[in-house]
């Protein structure tokens, strides 16, 4: 973006925001949107005022919230993002949203008064309230030493503001550099989670929100879980128990099923589901998910053909657990705001929401979603690696041809003595280039070993199909007496079988 506003324009917009009439806030927001589209970004003073309004009771007016978030999204589209590392604001947003969703029928929610701060104080601002509701043990306050401690009070942001701000933060982190296997030191999430147990606290709030939110919010929260987990090697093993415990604490079984279905397919979903299954029904020491489907062949590689045998190991424990776990019939339309989306749900093709869902149904859905995610991930990896191999070979051939042509042209124009000297120099350069290429290949091999990658191999789909088909029969036979929705189980298993049958067909 170009630059900040002038001082006079900044003062004008600030006065509009501070006016008692909400209409003036709308006017200021429209002016900011126009200026952001022209490449100008607001100074820190105006940014603070907008956030303060969203935290205050003035955000009960939907027009105010809509226009301010429109400004923030406009700035985000231009590459300017605000409040990415304000942990107090971020955790307050998710805690507040959790409070509102967990008590939607409350006729008079507790009122809070947010303490105001001057312009320069927001960077280190502690969000405080004079009176606030009692929160869960995951509520956070930050001590003077920077260590996370449990607190009973935190700023309670109005419902609409907390919802749109949560969506705003999720969209920002999604749009940033999230495609690598691990966050860099400059990534805001990396810096946020370096302090104390912040990642665990945030995950606890997110999983609690999933138990009460509407369909659109559940989709966003499911996406957010995979986005944070994409941080990878820096904290994935330590954070997985927190996610698994939060998943277990979700009261309604159909909410667990929806969470599994709404997570976007990919490596993160595969690791999460595999880790949660191992957490609930460990096949050994309980740490098998750390080395999930690893194959030593100069490195590591996920093998789909090893997935079904692993299912067999955990199925016995899972079915015993499900048969002993009492669970009341889960009805779909008993939760906050879910009826608004009952007619346009494209993500629950295998989920009969009008029928009861129990523990065994959730177990089968987790397995089927894990298998589908693994299939999609492996297919993408195989295609990308094969494509890269072909491209690398073509580039090498082109480089050889061009070097030969250049050498021939130069040989015709230059004397033999000069050619001999140049050829020697070229040979030396080629040897140096070969050494560099060998070093790069070694680095790539080491990177592949670290990331669980290998040269592409063709999955034995026929073997996998036969294994899973046999496993499906076993599941249907053993869980017949304890399942609540046999149709749901059959449809999910048949869905995976159909995919594998298609893959195994020559």
Swiss-Prot record:
Highest taxon, organism lineage: Eukaryota
Keyword Coiled coil found: yes
Region Disordered, annotated ranges: 104-144, 397-456
Keywords annotated in UniProt: Coiled coil
Coiled-coil regions listed in the entry: 405-455
Residue stretches of biased makeup (Low complexity): 130-144
Chain intervals with Basic and acidic residues compositional bias: 405-443
Protein known as: Uncharacterized protein DDB_G0286423
């Amino acid at each position: 973006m170009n630059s900040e506003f002038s001082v006079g324009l900044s003062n004008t917009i600030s006065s509009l925001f501070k006016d008692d009439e909400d209409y003036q806030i709308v006017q200021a927001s429209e002016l900011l949107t126009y200026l952001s589209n022209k490449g100008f970004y607001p100074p820190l003073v105006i940014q603070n005022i907008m956030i303060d309004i969203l935290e205050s009771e003035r955000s009960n007016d939907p027009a105010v919230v809509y226009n301010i978030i429109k400004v923030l999204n406009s700035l985000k589209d231009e590459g300017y993002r605000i409040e990415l590392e304000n942990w107090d604001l971020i955790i307050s947003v998710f805690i507040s949203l959790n409070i509102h969703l967990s008590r939607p029928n409350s006729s008079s929610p507790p009122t809070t008064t947010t303490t105001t701060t001057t312009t320069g104080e927001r960077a280190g601002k502690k969000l405080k309230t004079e009176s606030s509701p009692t929160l869960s043990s995951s509520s956070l306050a930050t001590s003077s030493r920077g260590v996370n401690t449990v607190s009973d009070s935190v700023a309670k942001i109005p419902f609409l503001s907390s919802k749109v701000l949560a969506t705003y933060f999720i969209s920002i982190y999604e749009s940033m550099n999230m495609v690598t296997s691990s966050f860099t030191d400059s990534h805001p999430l990396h810096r946020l989670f370096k302090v104390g147990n912040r990642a665990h606290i945030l995950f606890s709030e997110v999983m609690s929100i999933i138990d009460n939110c509407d369909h659109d919010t559940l989709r966003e929260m499911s996406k957010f879980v995979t986005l944070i987990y994409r941080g990878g090697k820096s904290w994935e093993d330590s954070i997985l128990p927190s996610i698994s415990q939060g998943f277990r604490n979700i009261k309604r079984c159909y909410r667990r099923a929806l969470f599994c279905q709404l997570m976007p397919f990919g490596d993160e979903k595969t690791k999460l589901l595999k880790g949660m299954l191992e957490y609930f029904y460990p096949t050994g020491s309980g740490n098998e998910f750390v080395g999930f489907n690893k194959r030593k062949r100069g490195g590591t590689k996920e093998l789909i053909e090893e997935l079904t045998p692993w299912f067999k190991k955990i199925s016995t424990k899972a079915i015993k657990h499900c048969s002993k776990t009492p669970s009341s019939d889960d009805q779909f339309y008993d939760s906050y705001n879910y009826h608004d989306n009952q007619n346009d749900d494209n993500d629950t093709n295998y989920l009969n929401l009008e029928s009861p869902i129990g523990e065994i149904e959730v177990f089968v859905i987790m397995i089927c979603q894990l298998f589908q995610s693994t299939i999609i991930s492996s297919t993408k990896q195989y295609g990308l690696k094969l494509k890269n191999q072909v491209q690398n070979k073509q580039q090498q051939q082109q480089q050889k041809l061009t070097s030969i042509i250049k050498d021939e042209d130069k040989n015709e124009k230059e004397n033999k003595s000069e050619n001999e000297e140049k050829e020697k120099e070229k040979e030396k350069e080629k040897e140096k280039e070969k050494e560099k290429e060998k070093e790069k290949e070694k680095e790539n091999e080491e990177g592949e070993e670290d990331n669980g990658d290998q040269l592409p191999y063709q999955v034995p789909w026929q073997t996998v199909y036969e294994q899973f088909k046999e496993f499906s029969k076993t599941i249907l036979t053993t869980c017949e007496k304890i399942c609540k929705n046999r149709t749901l189980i059959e449809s999910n298993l048949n869905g995976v079988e159909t995919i594998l049958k298609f893959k195994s067909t020559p």
